[in-house]
Amino acid sequence: MTNQSYYETMYILRPDIAEDEVTNHIDKYNKLLEEFGGTILDSQMRGKRRLAYQIAKHREGIYVQLSHQGDGQHIFKIEKAMRISEDVIRYMTVKQEGPLPTPKPSNKSSTQSENKDNPETKVESKEEQSVTNSDTSTTKKDDNEIKENTES
């Protein structure tokens, strides 16, 4: 078996194709990749987004991200299939150093509720407020002393 490298392919589909056609295209390229000897690690539809510049008279596109592993020969074949397709308006494959880490779900509400339940964070914030108040009072005191010294 040859050396298996990690790759990420991002391709943009035309914005005017139907949702079921989008899933058909995703399935089609996933199957082609596996047929040509690649292993799919992750496939995500990123949704319709505005393009930075107009491509093939389109201002928007449907982004699809595909993480895969293989010997590198499968990339030429999958890119050829994308080049021939009229529904793919842009594609790019990048070689990765290793497998991409799985994204952790970031819930702002869960971290906020943890902070509310944790009494240490409340104490720290009260201490910070008292330090801020004491700093401003010292500054006023120093300002008054300077004014008195300049007046004398």
UniProtKB/Swiss-Prot annotation:
<comment type="function">
    <text>Binds together with bS18 to 16S ribosomal RNA.</text>
</comment>
<protein>
    <recommendedName>
        <fullName>Small ribosomal subunit protein bS6</fullName>
    </recommendedName>
</protein>
<dbReference type="InterPro" id="IPR020814">
    <property type="entry name" value="Ribosomal_S6_plastid/chlpt"/>
</dbReference>
<feature type="region of interest" description="Disordered">
    <location>
        <begin position="94"/>
        <end position="152"/>
    </location>
</feature>
<keyword id="KW-0694">RNA-binding</keyword>
<dbReference type="InterPro" id="IPR020815">
    <property type="entry name" value="Ribosomal_bS6_CS"/>
</dbReference>
<dbReference type="InterPro" id="IPR000529">
    <property type="entry name" value="Ribosomal_bS6"/>
</dbReference>
<keyword id="KW-0699">rRNA-binding</keyword>
<dbReference type="Pfam" id="PF01250">
    <property type="entry name" value="Ribosomal_S6"/>
</dbReference>
<keyword id="KW-0687">Ribonucleoprotein</keyword>
<dbReference type="GO" id="GO:0070181">
    <property type="term" value="F:small ribosomal subunit rRNA binding"/>
</dbReference>
<keyword id="KW-0689">Ribosomal protein</keyword>
<feature type="compositionally biased region" description="Basic and acidic residues">
    <location>
        <begin position="138"/>
        <end position="152"/>
    </location>
</feature>
<dbReference type="GO" id="GO:0003735">
    <property type="term" value="F:structural constituent of ribosome"/>
</dbReference>
<dbReference type="GO" id="GO:0005737">
    <property type="term" value="C:cytoplasm"/>
</dbReference>
<dbReference type="InterPro" id="IPR014717">
    <property type="entry name" value="Transl_elong_EF1B/ribsomal_bS6"/>
</dbReference>
<dbReference type="InterPro" id="IPR035980">
    <property type="entry name" value="Ribosomal_bS6_sf"/>
</dbReference>
<comment type="similarity">
    <text>Belongs to the bacterial ribosomal protein bS6 family.</text>
</comment>
<dbReference type="GO" id="GO:1990904">
    <property type="term" value="C:ribonucleoprotein complex"/>
</dbReference>
<feature type="compositionally biased region" description="Basic and acidic residues">
    <location>
        <begin position="114"/>
        <end position="129"/>
    </location>
</feature>
<dbReference type="GO" id="GO:0006412">
    <property type="term" value="P:translation"/>
</dbReference>
<dbReference type="GO" id="GO:0005840">
    <property type="term" value="C:ribosome"/>
</dbReference>
